[in-house]
Curated annotation (Swiss-Prot):
Consists of three domains, a large central CORE domain and two small peripheral domains, NMPbind and LID, which undergo movements during catalysis. The LID domain closes over the site of phosphoryl transfer upon ATP binding. Assembling and dissambling the active center during each catalytic cycle provides an effective means to prevent ATP hydrolysis. Some bacteria have evolved a zinc-coordinating structure that stabilizes the LID domain. It is found in: Cytoplasm. One of its GO terms (cellular component) is cytoplasm. InterPro entries: Adenyl_kin_sub, Adenylat/UMP-CMP_kin, Adenylat_kinase_CS, Adenylate_kinase_lid-dom, P-loop_NTPase. Zn(2+) binds at C130, C133, C150, C153. GO terms for biological process: AMP salvage. This is Adenylate kinase. Its EC number is 2.7.4.3. SUPFAM superfamilies: P-loop containing nucleoside triphosphate hydrolases. Keywords: ATP-binding, Cytoplasm, Kinase, Metal-binding, Nucleotide biosynthesis, Nucleotide-binding, Transferase, Zinc. ATP binds at G10, A11, G12, K13, G14, T15, R127, T136, Y137, K199. GO terms for molecular function: adenylate kinase activity; ATP binding; zinc ion binding. Monomer.
Amino acid sequence: MKIIMLGAPGAGKGTQAKQIAAKYSIPHISTGDIFRANIKNGTELGKKAKTYMDQGALVPDELTCDLVMDRIQQDDCKNGFVLDGFPRTIPQAKALDDALTKIGEKMDYAIDVDVPDENIVNRMGGRRACLNCGATYHIVFNPTKVEGKCDACGADTVLRDDDKPETVQKRLAVYHEQTQPLIEYYDKQGILKSVDGTKPMDEVFSAIVGILGE
């Protein structure tokens, strides 16, 4: 079972991807993890990626796809995998499809965790992070016991720059321009499934399990 998770930043697709991976005993694969692992292990692909990342540049699609293909051809992916954070653009999706076709494979599902922009801004604007230990909270869904203080270490919690409304709006604009076209792309392939991401996390997961089967 080969699955791609789609959805805007803050839609909760990463959380759902982890739960899918645990339930179906398949790896949860994020591009960030792949980059870090290859750089840490000093692979040739990792060295190439690091030269771009050190300059603050985006890693080219072709190299990112090579890294992903290298990962999904490892033994633990024989029964499937969940891709989280890749592909992000139509060129990446086409590169992935082409690479999979060469090894006689194809994606089975593209699951879109659908959340309106307004909900995303409110959801991310409520996030708080501990300045000291990095623990994360939410003022509505997962508040600290003492307002503004971390439950774990007692240090101050703050709204990160990444979660400020103006930053979230910019990230959403990029998503709508670059990533949302993937919804139509996978719909045309007949593998797109959409779930209502505004519902509680366990209900969203139940809906996904309903699509994938027990």
